[in-house]
Each structure stands twice: as structure tokens, then as C-alpha cells.
Amino acid sequence: MLVLINTIQEQASEAIKQATDIVALEQIRVDFLGKKGKLTELLKGLANLSAEEKPKVGQLVNQAKQGISALIETKMIELKEKQLLAKLAAEQIDVTLPGRNHSTGSLHPVTQVKHRINDYFSRLGFDIVEGPEIETEFYNFEALNIPGHHPARAMHDTFYFGDGRLLRTHTSPVQIRTMEQRKPPFRLIAPGRVYRCDSDVTHTPMFHQVEGLLIDKQATLAGLKGLLQDFFSYFFGRELALRFRPSYFPFTEPSAEVDIECTQCNGKGCRSCKFTGWLEVLGCGMVHPNVLIAVNIDPNEYHGWAFGMGMDRLAMLYYGIDDLRMLFENDLTFLRQF
């Protein structure tokens, strides 16, 4: 019996050494240790042995099972390591291969213009403030001295909600809210989206505007003129002639519209400026006393000036774009130029 047990152990050991994969190794386990395996059959034959032989033979068979199990476990670890290494070798990535190209994005031309404007005015100590795009009639009209019969308050010019609120038509409400919260003197600009019922080559229902405001005891129209002259020279990178034309805005008095020398023809006259040599770029003026009174600022002590200009318009002039709608069509071929 001892010889038979040793023979089975040797057979199992040799078979385990020859196993080349996990499936073959599992079959060896079944052949020697399974329900019908060779060692299991020996245990079944213990019933035919004498009472003295049973314990000895049973102990030897169990030792053989433990030895074979240990060999199988060791071989299993070895085969799994080889299998993993083979898989890694098959899936190896060549890090020297060139990577896949990804197109890089860029800032939208209007965003670039906004950054240039913010950079200029922040250097002069202006705060950059923002406010809600859904406004009340008080902040959008009444506090700005725009009466109920003014055309700007008509349905065909302003987007109204059912509850009487509206999409702001300018960023002036931001200035009103700021004046309510702060004590003068202060200076600020308010860039943001605004909305009006208009759509053509030079107008869109949504556009970008930036407005500036300064409240101080020494604010003058001459100071505003000098600031705007310096700003446009900075923005376009060269000296430009400015022209102030008398105008009317409910929230400023006196009011003016500002033209700059045409950037396309240097004031000589072309299609862009309709052969006038001038391009209209903004409206401005001294803050109306009624606006100051609406926010509890004494107009006898403080004065202010304000201006407003379209950032989309400036982007068109700066980059030579002739159709405003191109800025909003999300054409990557067009936008990648900037």
C-alpha cells in the first residue's frame, strides 16, 4: 500500500510539472483528488484493511493529498503569473507612438474684447460689477428716468414676462443696484448680456454691452471725454479722432453720441462708414439728477458721468467683421480665426 501511495504521489508531481495551463492543472486535481480520483479511491479501500493498518494507511493518504494540493496551489500561482505576463505583453502600448491630435479651442472674439475692456478699466480703479438679466421695470426704466410713455418700454422693443418682469435692455440696472448699495464716490463698469426685439445685419435679439459709471464731487464731461479718447487709443492700438455729437438719453443730461474715426479707411470714407469717415460707437453724458435722486444721492453734492457701448460692435470693428450674426452662428471655421 505504501508503494502504491508513493507511486500516485510521483505521478501527480510529474503531471503537475508538465501542466502548461490552468485547465490542465484543474484536470490533474480532479484525477487525483476528485470524488473519483486515485487517492479518493484508496480511502474507500480502507474498509478492507485490518484495524491496525487503517490508521497508518489513512494518515499516509491524507499526507499525500496535502502534498499534492500544495503542489497544485504553487503551480496555479506560477501559471497565473505567466498568464498575466502574456496578457500584458499582448496588450503592451508603444509609448513612442505619436498621440492623437486634439483641436485646441480659443476665446470667442466677444470674450476677448470683454477682457480687453475689463483690463483697461480695472487698471484705472474701476470695479467690474454684474447683475441679474431678468429685471423689474423700476430698475430697467423708472430709476433711470425713463417715463411710462417712452418708446423703449413698448412691447415691440422689450421682452416682457407674464408677471411684468422683463429681460434687461441695457446693463444700467446694475448701476442702479450698485448705487443703492454703495456710498459715493465710486467708479465701475458693468459688462453683460442684454436683450431687445431687434434682428438684422447689425442687430441681434441678444447682444453684449458694457456701461461705465463714475460718481464723484469733481466729475466733469471733460474728464469723460479724455477717458474715452485714451480708451479707444488703447483698444485699437493707435491714436483715433473722436467726435461728440449732442444727443438725448433720459438718464443723462447733457447727452452725447460718440463717433470714432473709421478704422477701415482712417477717416477717408468707405462702405463701412457709409463714406462719412466716422463710426458711431457709444452714447454717454452726465448722470441726470433724477437718477441720483432715485438712489438717494444728493445731486447738489455729487455729480457723475456714464457711458454705454456694444461689445459686439467693438468686436466687429476690431476684427473687421461685416455681419454681426457671424458672431452667434457657432461656425468653428469662422471662430478659429481669432
From Swiss-Prot:
An example Gene Ontology CC term for this record: cytoplasm
Subcellular location, record wording: Cytoplasm
Domain of life: Bacteria
GO BP: any one term: phenylalanyl-tRNA aminoacylation
Cofactor binding: number and manner: Binds 2 magnesium ions per tetramer.
Binding site for Mg(2+): 253
First-tier enzyme category under EC: ligase
Cofactors, names only: Mg(2+)
Single GO MF annotation: magnesium ion binding
Gene3D superfamilies, per database record: Bira Bifunctional Protein, Domain 2
Catalysed reaction, written as an equation: tRNA(Phe) + L-phenylalanine + ATP = L-phenylalanyl-tRNA(Phe) + AMP + diphosphate + H(+)
InterPro entries: aa-tRNA-synth_II, aa-tRNA-synth_II/BPL/LPL, Phe-tRNA-synth_IIc_asu, Phe-tRNA_ligase_II_N, Phe_tRNA_ligase_alpha1_bac, Phenylalanyl-tRNA_Synthase, tRNA-bd_arm
Main localization (coarse): cytoplasm
EC number(s) per entry: 6.1.1.20
Subunit and partners: Tetramer of two alpha and two beta subunits.
Family named by the database record: Belongs to the class-II aminoacyl-tRNA synthetase family. Phe-tRNA synthetase alpha subunit type 1 subfamily.
Designated name of the protein: Phenylalanine--tRNA ligase alpha subunit
Gene: pheS
